[in-house]
C-alpha cells in the first residue's frame, strides 16, 4: 500500500492553554436530531411524507427539543413536509424545528416562507470553508468566502423576524485553518449581533472526519476560547464517522466547551454516518448522568428506525444491537451470572455487572440470550438452564455437561438454542431408561427404617428388588448392590422445586462413585419428590452398568 500518497487534511491547532483533558462530562448537552435531513438524504429510499411525520413524532416522544426537519428550498418534498408540520400543529410548544439554507437570496426567501406560522424555528446557514473546497470546488479566496457568509446573514435578516433563532456552520470545519475558522465565525457573530438572551449557535462540523478525536477537541476548545461574544454563543458540534470515532469526537468536544450536539439515531448519515446520539446519551446514562432523552423503550425505537430508514442495525451495535446483551465467552457468562445472583441477594444502590454497563431492563431489553457455543462455559449453561427451565444445576455437574456441550457445538459449528441445550441435558442426565428403568415401586417406613419393593428393568430385564435402609434411596442403593454386585456410594444429593407451587415438579441431582472413584451423575424430574430421587439414582446407576 502506497501510504506516501496521503497526508493529513487537517491543520495544526496553534499553541493555546487547553483544559479539556482534565475534564469529565457532568450533564447532557442540548440535543438536535438531524435524522430527517442529514439522515434522510443518505437513504437508498428517502422517507415519504407519511414516514417523515411518523419519524418526527417518534423524535418528539424520545424528547428531542430541537429537530432539523429539512432543507425546504432544496426540494418540494422537504418544503411540503415543513409546511405540513406547521399547518397541522404537530410541533409542540417546547420543540423547535431547524431548517437548512445556503447563502443565496432565493433559497433564503423560500426557507423563510416555509416557516410561515411557526412559533419559533432555527434557520441554519452554512457554507464550506476548508482550504481544499475553497481551492478546488468554489475557486474563492478567504475574503470571498467570508463575504458569502456575511451576505447570507444579511439576507436572513431581511426576510426573517425575531421569532427565529440562528445557526451558522463553517462546513468542513475540521479541514479548515483555525485562524480562518475564527475569522469567519466572528464575522458572522458581528453581523448577527447575538445577546445572552438571544444566542447564536456556532456549529463546528467534522463534515469529513480526518483526525483523531483529541485533535478535534483541540479545534473546538481553541474556537471556544477565541469566539467573540462567547456568552452569547452556543458552541455546537456535528460529527461524522469516517474514521469510526464520531461518538468519541462529540464526547471529547463536550469536554472542550461544546454545549450542543447534532446527530442521528444509531448513526445514520452520509458515507459512514453521523455521530450516534443514542449511544452518546446512553454512555452518559451508564455513568449516572440524566441524558434528557427517553430511551427506555429502545426496542420500539429500533423497530421504527428499521421501518422508516429501511436499514438494519449491526448486531454488535452498542446498546441497540441484537447481540449487545449476549455473551459467548465462558468466563464472561460466568461473571454475568454471578453478578446477577449477587445483586439478587445483596441489594445495591447502583447497577453492578462486569460485562453489562447498563441494566437491559432499563431499555426494555433483556439479558437473554446468553448464547452457547464451543467457547461457552458453565456460567452460561447455568444461566440458561436456570432462567429458562428452572434447573439449579450443581457446579460439578455443570462442569461435566459443559464438556458435552462443547463437543456438540463444535460439531454443529453454530450457536445452541436454549431448547437444544435442555434436550441435550435431558438426553444425558434426566430420567434415563437405557440400562436402569423404573417400572414401579413401593416403600413404607417402620420407625427409622424404610422398606422398599421396586420393579426395575436392568439392561432390559425386569427385576423385583426388595431391601431396607434408612430411607428410600438407601434402601434402593442396597437393593441395586445386592442384585448386580456393583459397589457404589452416593456422594452428592440435592433437590429443589421447579416451580413455587405445591403441584410443581421436583428436580433431584445425584452423583455416585464406583470403587475406582469414577463419578456418575443422574437427574430425576417428577411431581413426587421421592420418585424424582429414585429416578435420579437409577439414571446415575445405569451409567455404571
Residue ranges and their predicted role:
Residues 452-456, 498-521:
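Positively charged, aromatic-enriched nucleic acid-contacting surfaces
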Residues 518-521, 525-545:
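Mixed-charge, glycine-accented linear interaction segment located at domain edges/termini
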Amino acid at each position: 500500500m502506497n501510504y506516501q500518497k496521503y497526508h493529513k487534511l487537517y491543520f495544526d491547532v496553534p499553541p493555546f492553554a487547553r483544559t479539556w483533558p482534565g475534564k469529565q462530562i457532568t450533564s447532557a448537552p442540548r440535543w438536535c436530531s438531524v435524522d430527517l435531513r442529514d439522515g434522510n438524504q443518505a437513504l437508498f429510499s428517502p422517507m415519504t411524507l407519511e414516514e417523515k411525520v411518523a419519524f418526527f413524532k417518534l423524535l418528539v416522544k424520545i424528547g428531542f427539543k430541537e429537530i432539523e426537519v429539512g432543507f425546504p428550498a432544496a426540494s418540494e418534498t422537504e418544503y411540503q413536509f415543513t409546511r405540513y408540520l406547521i399547518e397541522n400543529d404537530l410541533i409542540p410548544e417546547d420543540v423547535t424545528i431547524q431548517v437548512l439554507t445556503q447563502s443565496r437570496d432565493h433559497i433564503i426567501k423560500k426557507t423563510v416562507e416555509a416557516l410561515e406560522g411557526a412559533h419559533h424555528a432555527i434557520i441554519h446557514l452554512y457554507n464550506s470553508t476548508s482550504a481544499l473546497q475553497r481551492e478546488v470546488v468554489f475557486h474563492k479566496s478567504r475574503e470571498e468566502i467570508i463575504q458569502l457568509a456575511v451576505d447570507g446573514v444579511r439576507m436572513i435578516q431581511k426576510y426573517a423576524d425575531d421569532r427565529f433563532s440562528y445557526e451558522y456552520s463553517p462546513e468542513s470545519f475540521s479541514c479548515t485553518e483555525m485562524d480562518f475558522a475564527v475569522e469567519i465565525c466572528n464575522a458572522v457573530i458581528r453581523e448577527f449581533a447575538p445577546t445572552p438572551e438571544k444566542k447564536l449557535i456556532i456549529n463546528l462540523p467534522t463534515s469529513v472526519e480526518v483526525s483523531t478525536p483529541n485533535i478535534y477537541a483541540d479545534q473546538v476548545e481553541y474556537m471556544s476560547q477565541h469566539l467573540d461574544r462567547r456568552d452569547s454563543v452556543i458552541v455546537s458540534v456535528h460529527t461524522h464517522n469516517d474514521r469510526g470515532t464520531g461518538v468519541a469526537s462529540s464526547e471529547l468536544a463536550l469536554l472542550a466547551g461544546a454545549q450542543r450536539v447534532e446527530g442521528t439515531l444509531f448513526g445514520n448519515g452520509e458515507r459512514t454516518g453521523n455521530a450516534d446520539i443514542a449511544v452518546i446519551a446512553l454512555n452518559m446514562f451508564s455513568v449516572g448522568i440524566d441524558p434528557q432523552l427517553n430511551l427506555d423503550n429502545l426496542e420500539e425505537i429500533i423497530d421504527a428506525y428499521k421501518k422508516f430508514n429501511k436499514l438494519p442495525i449491526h448486531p454488535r451495535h452498542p446498546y441497540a444491537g441484537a447481540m449487545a446483551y449476549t455473551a459467548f465467552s465462558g468466563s464472561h457468562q460466568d461473571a454475568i451470572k454471578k453478578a446477577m445472583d449477587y445483586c439478587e441477594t445483596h441489594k445495591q444502590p447502583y447497577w453492578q455487572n462486569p460485562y453489562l454497563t447498563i441494566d437491559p431492563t432499563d431499555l426494555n431489553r433483556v439479558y437473554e440470550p446468553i448464547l452457547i457455543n464451543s467457547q461457552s462455559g458453565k456460567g452460561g449453561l447455568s444461566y440458561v438452564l436456570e432462567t429458562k427451565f428452572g434447573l439449579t444445576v450443581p457446579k460439578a455437574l455443570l462442569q461435566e455437561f459443559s464438556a458435552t456441550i462443547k463437543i456438540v457445538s463444535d460439531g454443529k459449528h453454530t450457536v445452541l438454542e436454549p431448547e437444544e441445550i435442555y434436550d441435550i441435558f435431558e438426553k444425558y442426565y434426566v430420567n434415563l431408561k437405557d440400562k436402569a428403568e423404573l417400572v414401579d415401586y413401593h416403600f413404607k417406613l417402620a420407625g427409622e427404617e424404610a422398606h422398599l419393593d421396586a420393579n426395575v428393568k436392568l439392561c432390559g430385564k425386569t427385576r423385583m428388588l426388595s431391601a431396607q435402609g434408612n430411607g428410600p434411596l438407601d434402601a434402593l442403593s442396597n437393593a441395586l448392590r445386592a442384585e448386580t454386585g456393583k459397589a457404589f456410594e452416593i456422594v452428592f444429593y440435592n433437590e429443589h422445586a421447579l416451580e413455587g407451587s405445591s403441584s410443581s415438579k421436583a428436580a433431584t441431582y445425584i452423583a455416585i462413585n464406583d470403587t475406582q472413584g469414577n463419578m456418575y451423575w443422574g437427574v430425576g424430574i417428577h411431581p413426587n419428590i421421592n420418585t424424582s430421587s429414585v429416578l435420579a439414582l437409577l439414571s446415575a446407576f445405569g451409567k455404571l452398568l
